[in-house]
Amino acid sequence: MPRSRTNGNFIDKTFSIVADILLRVIPTTSGEKEAFTYYRDGMSAQSEGNYAEALQNYYEAMRLEIDPYDRSYILYNIGLIHTSNGEHTKALEYYFRALERNPFLPQAFNNMAVICHYRGEQAIQQGDSEIAEAWFDQAAEYWKQAIALTPGNYIEAHNWLKITRRFE
């Protein structure tokens, strides 16, 4: 039985019911339906902190999903898991792959910026201001892209860009 059918969370159950209805109404292939089921189960496991199970579901969804736009969200969620696990290099790779398929994911740009900013802070703690500035400059570029896609969002990043004179 798919995970989404056994989940006790009200929101997840509601999402599952709506998704099942949409899958019946919207013309989709069996492969697309199966890919979505794995994606949905991955989101459910991820929301509960079951990252290994979520990754298994996402990898299976990636194997089945052919639409680049849908694949971008799978890749983005894999990036989120790697970020949560502190695997920043892997996370950056998955965010980048998501953006290759869908360049309109401001949240991926934001997460990449946060990782770069964090690495800049680490470099400062290690006494390497030159490396820190390079990381901060990269964070600024990613934040500018996120802000350009969704003006009015990422207020803290926007303020940081102004304060550090990185906003043009």
UniProtKB/Swiss-Prot annotation:
GO terms for biological process: photosystem I assembly. The keyword Membrane applies. TPR repeats lie at residues 35-68, 72-105, 120-153. Transmembrane segments: none annotated. It is a peripheral membrane protein. PROSITE patterns: TPR (PS50005), TPR_REGION (PS50293). GO terms for cellular component: chloroplast thylakoid membrane. Keywords: Chloroplast, Membrane, Photosynthesis, Plastid, Repeat, Thylakoid, TPR repeat. InterPro entries: PSI_Ycf3_assembly (IPR022818), TPR-like_helical_dom_sf (IPR011990), TPR_rpt (IPR019734), Ycf3/AcsC/BcsC/TPR_MFPF (IPR051685). Coiled coil: none annotated. It is found in: Plastid, Chloroplast thylakoid membrane. Belongs to the Ycf3 family. Essential for the assembly of the photosystem I (PSI) complex. May act as a chaperone-like factor to guide the assembly of the PSI subunits. This is Photosystem I assembly protein Ycf3. It comes from Solanum tuberosum.
